[in-house]
């Protein structure tokens, strides 16, 4: 079954088309200019199993034909567990290499926050551009989102989430993309620097790129939301 529908963003030049096909959720992020319309991001959220691998491969090929600039796979954390000692892992790994980025063990909330991150690179004030998402095919990413009305609490939440996620990791990340998302609240440079400093244990020097977007409709005007994409070495 295919379900489709558009949603508007805060800016007329960016739209998100939602598609659902047999339980596979897809978000298509379009960039519109005066003379052209481009499919910049395609995010595919699915529960991996041996039966649907062919369907996912077909979708990726279809979006390549549509000239999608960046295809991101989000694997549902609630899906069937993968046996790493089995040939299934080889098939899974082969599928992941077909995406530009893939986020393993993703929740539906992670998927929605990642869609918001991608649209913010089009509607906010970014230093992140589309080419920053382009690395070696199959690059694994890790995703963290936290929000609070207090900078100190936000720093603590981000630090704790990162410590938990990267508890068995010693190497720092070479590239991190950060979105600061608010609804009318404009972060000061000092506040941004404080939030960057909370990441010192996890990122290399000068590895950060960021986007500021203070037009997140529906968000509490006092709340600051921070989403981070940590990229493995490509």
Predicted feature descriptions by range:
Residues 1-234:
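Tubulin/FtsZ superfamily GTPase core signature
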């Amino acid at each position: 079954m295919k379900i489709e529908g558009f949603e508007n963003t805060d800016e007329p030049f960016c739209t998100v088309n939602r598609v659902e096909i047999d339980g596979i959720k897809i978000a298509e992020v379009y960039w519109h200019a005066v003379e052209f319309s481009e499919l910049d991001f395609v995010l595919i959220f699915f529960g991996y199993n041996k039966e649907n691998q062919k369907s996912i491969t077909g979708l990726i090929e279809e979006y390549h034909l549509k000239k999608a600039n960046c295809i991101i796979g989000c694997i549902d954390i609630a899906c069937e567990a993968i046996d790493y000692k089995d040939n299934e892992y080889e098939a899974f790994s082969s599928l992941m290499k077909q995406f530009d980025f893939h986020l393993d063990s993703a929740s539906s909330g992670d998927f929605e926050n990642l869609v918001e991150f991608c649209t913010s690179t089009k509607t906010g004030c970014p230093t992140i551009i589309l080419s920053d998402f382009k690395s070696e095919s199959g690059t694994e990413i890790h995703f963290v989102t936290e929000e609070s009305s207090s900078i100190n609490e936000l720093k603590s939440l981000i630090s704790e989430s990162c410590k938990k996620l990267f508890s068995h990791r010693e190497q720092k990340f070479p590239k991190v993309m950060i979105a600061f998302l608010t609804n009318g609240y404009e972060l000061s440079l000092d506040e941004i620097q404080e939030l960057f400093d909370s990441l010192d244990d996890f990122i290399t020097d000068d590895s950060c790129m960021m986007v500021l977007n203070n037009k997140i409709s529906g968000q509490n005007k006092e709340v600051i939301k921070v989403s981070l994409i940590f990229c493995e070495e490509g």
